[in-house]
Amino acid sequence: MSLNRSEKEAVINEVTSLAAKAQTLVIAEYRGITVADMTKLRVDARSKGVSLSVLKNTLARRAVAGSQFDVVADQMTGPLIYGFSEDAVAAAKVVADFAKTNDKLVIRGGAFAGKALDVNGVKQLANIPSKEVLLAQLCGLLMSPISRTAVVLGALAAKKGEGEAAAA
């Protein structure tokens, strides 16, 4: 089904606004994926804040022109699904995890921080823990010396308390 000019402009405007807010774009070929599998992928993506779209490549190229994702315009050929996310790793994680279980989804590349990523770059990005996990790990590292000091002081107080009880 072909789109008229106003519908094409609406699609371009929508994708342009997605690209302006997003940190990451992941591009994957979806040839041969069943509707049920594609629905699972979309539900998983939506739950993680990733916007997945199947777009005409010419419209996608126009939408990302002048943005940080312009570096992957040459990769936009064939039947592709585009994943935009505001979280730096969410789109890569969703697509890479799905590609592990479904060999028909082929990651073609992506972009992050204005740089084009190849397949290995997307997979490496997917292996990075999420922002929340990294913040939790940082808090744990910061709390570790404090909690160790508290344990040592508690042990000293208990030992001193035993010494006073034995003297009495």
UniProtKB/Swiss-Prot annotation:
- State if rRNA-binding is listed as a keyword: yes
What's the domain of life for this entry?
A: Bacteria
Q: Keywords for this entry? A: Ribonucleoprotein, Ribosomal protein, RNA-binding, rRNA-binding
What is an example of a GO molecular function annotated in this UniProt entry? large ribosomal subunit rRNA binding
Coiled coil ranges (UniProt) are none
Which SUPFAM superfamilies has this protein been placed in?
Ribosomal protein L10-like
Q: Tell me the CDD domains matching this sequence.
A: Ribosomal_L10
What does the entry give for GO biological process? Answer: translation
User: InterPro entries this protein is in?
Assistant: Ribosomal_uL10, Ribosomal_uL10-like_sf, Ribosomal_uL10_bac, Ribosomal_uL10_bac_type, Ribosomal_uL10_CS_bac
Q: Which GO terms describe its cellular component?
A: large ribosomal subunit
Protein family membership: Belongs to the universal ribosomal protein uL10 family.
Its quaternary organisation is: Part of the ribosomal stalk of the 50S ribosomal subunit. The N-terminus interacts with L11 and the large rRNA to form the base of the stalk. The C-terminus forms an elongated spine to which L12 dimers bind in a sequential fashion forming a multimeric L10(L12)X complex.
Role noted for this protein: Forms part of the ribosomal stalk, playing a central role in the interaction of the ribosome with GTP-bound translation factors.
NCBIfam families in the record, alphabetically? PRK00099.1-1
The entry's protein name is Large ribosomal subunit protein uL10
What is the organism of origin for this protein? Paracidovorax citrulli (strain AAC00-1)
The lineage, from the top, is: Bacteria, Pseudomonadati, Pseudomonadota, Betaproteobacteria, Burkholderiales
